[in-house]
Amino acid sequence: MIIKPRVRGFICVSTHPTGCEANVREQIDYVKARGPIANGPKKVLVIGASTGYGLAARISAAFGSDAATLGVFFERAGSETKAGTAGWYNTAAFEKFATEKGLYATSINGDAFSDEVKARTIEVIKRDLGQVDLVVYSLAAPKRTHPKSGEVFSSTLKPVGKAVNLRGIDTDKEVIKETVLEPATQKEIDDTVAVMGGEDWQMWIDALLEAGVLADGAKTTAFTYLGEKITHDIYWNGSIGAAKKDLDQKVLGIREKLAAKGGDARVSVLKAVVTQASSAIPMMPLYLSLLFKVMKEKGTHEGCIEQVYGLYKDSLYGAAPHIDEEGRLRADYKELDPEVQNRVQELWTQVTNDNIYELTDFSGYKTDFLRLFGFEIAGVDYEADVNPDVQIPKLVQV
């Protein structure tokens, strides 16, 4: 079938298998061109491995450090008549290229919050790898079923304590709009912490430690975004911020446990990029469009693969890691450059319906958004017939 982008709100409901493969190849080529990561990881578990930062973490480990990788995610296969999810095609492509290079690559498809997926992951590590020396936690999910109580929690994107008026772009109509977000209730805050906080990361590490599948000296990192004052009402000071603060608390206990084995645990702060998660946040398309404009002009613009490869090389496995006073690894320092933030802040109030394309890089934002789903990739023939039924040969389905 011939597949074209079909966008509804902040989701593209179609995906292009060939485009997703080309996108993965571009990221692999970037890592290969930058050269190997000195003293990098060799056996890596990535939880949330199929898109965005998690996929970049898997690619960087495999092609920057010749690592065996095990990826966990929750994706949907395609059929002859219906496209699957982008993460499915990304993984099929990644496994194909990793196998061609002679690298171990296996994937587990299921709910990473569940005990079943944790148990199955441990089985596969024991069978194939023995132990892992890096665990990357990169889950982005709107809901979580608690593995012990069975309670279902939903995350909420709201301010805390006061209503907030946010500027943003209506990405369908391409106009500036103001959105009023009412404050979260205590239950909404608690539920957001249950979904996006550090409990599941801690459960993963505890399960891996108990099973004896974490190598001596093993590291773990969880990815997060903090942003600057322009996004603070909705991030750091909002319901999501409560979850991020929980992550900062939970990492201390995880670090202590791993330190006993000569290892380490860190929260890694990455820059704002276009992802399926960020496009759902009312102000982010406008913020990202302005950020892209300013950072591209400065020559400091980066996407997922540049960020994560840099995080591995400079901080996770570098001699002089970028670390803040809270002990977090920072890869977002180019975004937080005061010159960049001040310029974004200046432009923030100047943007109108008439000058969106002039003052912002909204066209770059739209391209990046479509690239998530395998569209707008150079060299791909979008008029060609494509089969959406793509297999992942080494998939473990839970």
Curated annotation (Swiss-Prot):
Enumerate the residues binding NAD(+): 48-53, 74-75, 111-112, 139-140, 244, 273-275
Q: How does it assemble?
A: Monomer.
Q: Please name the GO terms that the record assigns under molecular function.
A: enoyl-[acyl-carrier-protein] reductase (NADH) activity; NAD binding; trans-2-enoyl-CoA reductase (NADH) activity
Active site per database record: 235 (proton donor)
Under what name is this protein listed? Enoyl-[acyl-carrier-protein] reductase [NADH]
- The UniProt annotation places substrate binding at 225
Which residues are tagged with the site Plays an important role in discriminating NADH against NADPH? 75
**What GO terms in the biological process aspect are recorded for it?**
fatty acid biosynthetic process
Give the matching Pfam families. Answer: Eno-Rase_FAD_bd, Eno-Rase_NADH_b, Enoyl_reductase
Q: Could you tell me the keywords of this UniProt record?
A: Fatty acid biosynthesis, Fatty acid metabolism, Lipid biosynthesis, Lipid metabolism, NAD, Oxidoreductase
Q: Does the entry feature the keyword tRNA processing, yes or no? A: no
Enzyme nomenclature, EC number: 1.3.1.9
Catalysed reactions, semicolon-separated: a 2,3-saturated acyl-[ACP] + NAD(+) = a (2E)-enoyl-[ACP] + NADH + H(+)
Function of this protein?
Involved in the final reduction of the elongation cycle of fatty acid synthesis (FAS II). Catalyzes the reduction of a carbon-carbon double bond in an enoyl moiety that is covalently linked to an acyl carrier protein (ACP).
